[in-house]
From Swiss-Prot:
Gene responsible for this protein: dut
Documented EC number(s): 3.6.1.23
Record: residues binding substrate: R65, S66, G67, N78, T82, I83, D84
CDD domains given in the database record: trimeric_dUTPase
Catalytic activity line of the entry: dUTP + H2O = dUMP + diphosphate + H(+)
Protein name: Deoxyuridine 5'-triphosphate nucleotidohydrolase
GO annotation (BP), single: dUMP biosynthetic process
Function: This enzyme is involved in nucleotide metabolism: it produces dUMP, the immediate precursor of thymidine nucleotides and it decreases the intracellular concentration of dUTP so that uracil cannot be incorporated into DNA.
Naturally occurring in which organism (per UniProt): Chlorobaculum tepidum (strain ATCC 49652 / DSM 12025 / NBRC 103806 / TLS) (Chlorobium tepidum)
Keyword Repressor: no
Amino acid sequence: MIKVKIVRLNQKAILPVYATAHAAGMDVSACLDAPVTVPSSASALIPTGFAIELPEGYEAQLRPRSGLALRHCISLPNSPATIDADYRGEVGVILINHGREPFTVSHGDRIAQMVVAKVDHVVFEEVESLSETARGEGGFGHTGVQAKAECL
């Protein structure tokens, strides 16, 4: 288990919590003095009222909640959003409304999930060429959208 320091910046803040024993992400709630309405095709930065101190070598990822995406077309445009170990400011959640109707966020609404993950730093080695693979440079849908016969 990893210890993460957390500071309540607003007395009304609801700290992140795992909803079930085996949940990968903690629910993150809005900390608002008044409701915020996100118009269709717009985004808004929603405060959480807390800041965290992650151990070196870890990050926190903010991810959309599936229920908000399914029922209201609400997502995070920079998903997963990264909170670096050296960031000490308030955690904010950028919500985007892909739906046709305005979406209102109230204090205490669960608006995102937070997953804490280990981060490995890499060192790039510049080379003249890369090794060959069967896939090569194929990307962006090069395998099609239909299931292959051996998968059916």
